[in-house]
């Protein structure tokens, strides 16, 4: 059973675990990179964030806000 429904009612289905910790098939990986540039001027610190989420039961459906698909790309 696919957890993603497409069309006007696109949502991530029963397996939607948006903004919740769950054990099982869903995982979220976050990476933060800090760059310090030193030179003639004052020190500048730059932060870059990258976040990746995968839900195995959602057929490539990525949960957005309010458990909606972002984008709705069900197959």
UniProtKB/Swiss-Prot annotation:
Domain of life: Eukaryota
Pfam families in the cross-refs: Metallothio_2
Entry keyword set: Metal-binding, Metal-thiolate cluster
Keyword Metal-binding (UniProt): yes
Molecular function (Gene Ontology), one example: metal ion binding
InterPro entries: Metalthion_15p
Similarity section: Belongs to the metallothionein superfamily. Type 15 family.
Role, per record: Metallothioneins have a high content of cysteine residues that bind various heavy metals.
Protein name (Swiss-Prot/TrEMBL): Metallothionein-like protein 1
Organism this protein belongs to: Trifolium repens (Creeping white clover)
